[in-house]
Amino acid sequence: MAEKSIFNEPDVDFHLKLNQQLFHIPYELLSKRIKHTQAVINKETKSLHEHTAALNQIFEHNDVEHDELALAKITEMIRKVDHIERFLNTQIKSYCQILNRIKKRLEFFHELKDIKSQNSGTSHNGNNEGTRTKLIQWYQSYTNILIGDYLTRNNPIKYNSETKDHWNSGVVFLKQSQLDDLIDYDVLLEANRISTSLLHERNLLPLISWINENKKTLTKKSSILEFQARLQEYIELLKVDNYTDAIVCFQRFLLPFVKSNFTDLKLASGLLIFIKYCNDQKPTSSTSSGFDTEEIKSQSLPMKKDRIFQHFFHKSLPRITSKPAVNTTDYDKSSLINLQSGDFERYLNLLDDQRWSVLNDLFLSDFYSMYGISQNDPLLIYLSLGISSLKTRDCLHPSDDENGNQETETATTAEKEVEDLQLFTLHSLKRKNCPVCSETFKPITQALPFAHHIQSQLFENPILLPNGNVYDSKKLKKLAKTLKKQNLISLNPGQIMDPVDMKIFCESDSIKMYPT
């Protein structure tokens, strides 16, 4: 039986379904660490068995020299056992921490269930004020968890020079609120750190290290992350003219993907030849002029070809003629034709810095799916659920603002007055205090569906205007005073304005409504 609601809040099952990651992440962490611990135990046990067998062979020689060897072997075995013991103690502490997180989270949601159970027992006599206060406090804590999750994911990791430690505002917020056991911030920080290294530092080492640690899991998922990371490493080596390491990277890390990514490998091979040949053609006295792929991609195709050719050869792109001006070998002819045709479009995507964003999205997708983490921030999910219930067909009309901005310079005085009146009714009446239309939530609300409202609200003093629209009489009179006070429109005494179509009517022309 579902718990009775106090103010239309969702039940416990709803929160559990939306927060499965709070229990799935610790489960994955425990699984990974148990597998790692078992592998270490098997390895060290095998090593101890080998040492024991060697020690037994030494004991067969009953002399002083072999006794010293036996003593050294026993000392080494004791050192290994101590090392295993320290390792196991460390692992046990980490297991206890993870289990304690799960326990705290179960208690957190059990608290919500208990509050709802108390409400069902006190609602008959109306004495539920204490329960209501507890529920509000629970939701305040839960909101802080959502905020901490969002900050941990999206805020950068900063370095404190005084304490010589790294910190994140989301983790600091969670610890200050004593909610750090209710979220796996260490996992989110790892994703944040690798993502920052890709987007802002252009550093592949953290990503490659993470790929090596989770290679088995990525292989089972048939992930292309490793190939794309190694391909980006290869491209970056070519950009700095490090052809030797680029070839080693190609042979060692890219060739194993020849069956699954043959087309991409052909393009990567062509990129090596293309850049090497172009650099050989550069004048020795010239310096690099920069290669802005973002600017080139925004230009037309002929301009792209000219800019790329200009970058590599420091001269204009030659035009195709009916006959070659000079006699060349067969290889030179084919090269000349390719260069004259400007067929560089296929290499632009490889050289584009946008690949870093694509690689980051691919990493986050694999990382979050590995731990069962939602790729969308839980805070934004809750905001979307709430805002979607407020979205109507009158929300989000960008054409109103755009038209006003475009016609400001050429508008006459009369048109300017009409425009000011339109902006006033738009922002002060139609969109006043509307979260859907606010600049803060507009990026979230644009893709949301409209709400399905099946109930209407009646005005306190409804009147029917001649155009068929119904409004509150007091609010129309208040609007008329505001418009005259701000000199937005000229209204005679006893006149009112419809805020939708901005037509002016006399109060005597309106009809008082009596809803039944």
Swiss-Prot record:
Enzyme kind, highest EC tier: transferase
Record domain CTLH: where: 187-245
SMART domains recorded: CTLH
Annotated zinc fingers (RING-Gid-type), start-end: 434-501
Subcellular location(s) per record: Cytoplasm; Nucleus
Annotated site, Essential for ubiquitin ligase activity, chain positions: C434
Main location (coarse class): cytoplasm
Gene Ontology CC: cytoplasm; GID complex; nucleus
BP-aspect Gene Ontology terms: negative regulation of apoptotic process; negative regulation of gluconeogenesis; proteasome-mediated ubiquitin-dependent protein catabolic process; protein ubiquitination
Cross-referenced PANTHER family: E3 UBIQUITIN-PROTEIN TRANSFERASE MAEA, MACROPHAGE ERYTHROBLAST ATTACHER-RELATED
Descriptive protein name: GID complex subunit 9
Species whose genome carries this gene: Saccharomyces cerevisiae (strain ATCC 204508 / S288c) (Baker's yeast)
